[in-house]
Design a protein with these regions (language model features):
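Conserved active-site alpha-helix within GNAT-family acetyltransferase domains
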Residues: 123, 127, 134-157
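Active-site rim helix/loop that mediates acceptor-substrate recognition in acyltransferases
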Residues: 23, 27-66
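Conserved N-terminal entry element of GNAT/NAT acetyltransferase domains
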Residues: 1-18, 25, 165-166
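Conserved acetyl-CoA pyrophosphate-binding loop and the N-cap/start of the following alpha-helix
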Residues: 103-104, 108-116
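A conserved beta-turn-beta hairpin within the catalytic core of GNAT-like acetyltransferases
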Residues: 82-95, 105, 154
Length: 166
């Protein structure tokens, strides 16, 4: 696990199928905000994105990173400029599409991935990150994220958290 690295999906687009399936398994079939086709389009856009900079201009920038351990995909995590929850679109940018291979959960990979994404965000000059979660609030709070909001929607209940990076 010490060899864990984040690689832009654009550098290894052929490796995106496994994390896409994880995303579909968790969120993509029946989510009223983000359909299976939306997930496929998200990964397609990530495979074509410019990872050299964060433009911060309010465009729908989506940077998807594969977590690799010895050239095996063990997770996926994204930095995005928008969120699918309309009420919170004014908060930017977001940690999104964060999934660890189900067979590798509980091994510290998720913490390493989140730390690596935060470092990339800092390098882009991003000062604060946001995310939402359905049931992992404690995981994020242990890593410095502060609880901001809880919302119960007809389709989903979620917590919004934020973290200062600077």
């Amino acid at each position: 696990m010490s060899g864990l690295i984040l690689v832009p999906l654009a550098d290894k687009p052929a490796m995106g199928h496994k994390p896409l399936q994880w995303s579909l398994d968790l969120w993509g079939t029946g989510n009223p905000w983000f359909s299976a086709e939306d997930w496929r389009s998200f990964y397609d856009r990530g495979a074509l994105a410019d990872y050299s900079r964060w433009d911060g201009a309010g465009v729908d920038q989506e940077l998807i990173y594969l977590a690799l351990d010895s050239d095996e995909v063990v997770g996926v995590i994204a930095l995005v400029d928008f969120d699918d929850v309309e009420e919170f679109r004014h908060l930017k940018p977001w940690v999104a599409a964060f999934v660890v291979d189900p067979a590798r959960r509980g091994t510290g990979i998720g913490s390493q991935m989140l730390t690596a994404l935060e470092e990339r965000a800092r390098n882009f000059g991003i000062q604060r990150l946001y995310l939402w979660t359905q049931d992992e609030r404690e995981f994020y709070q242990k890593r410095g994220y502060e609880f901001l909001h809880h919302r119960d929607y007809p389709e989903i209940s979620l917590d919004v958290l934020g973290k200062d990076l600077i």
